[in-house]
Amino acid sequence: MFRRPKGTRDFLPEDMKFRRHIEKTIRKVFESYSYEEILTPTFEYFDLIAEKSGEEIRRSVYVFEDKGGRTLALRPEMTAPIARVIANELRSRPKPLRLYYITNVFRYEEPQRGRWREFWHAGVELVGSSRVESDVEVISLGCEVLETLGFKYYVKLGDVSEIRNVLSEIGVTDEKEQNLILSMIDRGGDYSSYLESKGFDPRALNELFSTREVNTEKIRQVLNLMEDKFSDRVIVDLKLSRGLDYYTGLVFEFYVEGLDVAVGGGGRYDK
């Protein structure tokens, strides 16, 4: 008897009915915000993933070589492939672009609750706007999806740019070093001891995290702009960085009642 590969699953007819209902609901919400669907190849050149995806994702990529000796990778996420499409195919389109996707992605991770090696990913990319209203739009869109599906949920909101600013002020100016510290903060690691071992004073960073006030202008703007029905769902967490190298500003994660892992998330990346 053959078994399915570890970290994958079969969808039986009753599962597919439920899945299609979820997908239909997500599509309806995305399109109500004027987002258009996009689909990219299941595999990309590995160089694209290596350059555009974060270190955490790069470590979990399925990599293989084709018969021509080219190194390829199964897509581990959709941000890098869509960035490629925008640069090559949509460069001349009027901005901002509003794109969405619902597709499968692949990561070689240790299977556990909420973690699969093949899983389905629904998301949006809003490209070409630096306005905070764009961040609010994407967060509100996620809230509306969860609300429409009937989940009890909340949103964690952070600001990676504020952490990077403080790190620069205390002397940590190297981007790779900042990314390492952001990853430690996101995982709950002992970033203070690490900074001290490198000769940096962590007190300013500790003060940023210990304050109970909403002390970044961007977060204040988001809370002011969000509709009343969504703003009470937001919890500010300045330690949130999502563990990905490419975020440069606001970041967020969605949580639903009964699950201790995020069911979604994202953030601003301007590079």
Give, region by region, the residue ranges found by the protein language model.
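Positively charged, Gly/Ser-enriched RNA/tRNA-binding surfaces
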Residues: D15-Y33, E44-Y45, F64, G68, ...
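Auxiliary tRNA-acceptor-end handling modules of aminoacyl-tRNA synthetases
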Residues: M1-M16
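Short, conserved phosphate-binding/catalytic loop or strand-edge motifs used
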Residues: E118-A122, L157-N165
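Polyanion/phosphate-binding surface patch
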Residues: T42-L72
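Charged, compositionally biased N-terminal leader segments and the immediate start
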Residues: M1-R3, Y154, V172
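Short glycine/threonine-rich loop-to-helix capping motif typified by GTGT followed
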Residues: V166-T173, Y246-F252
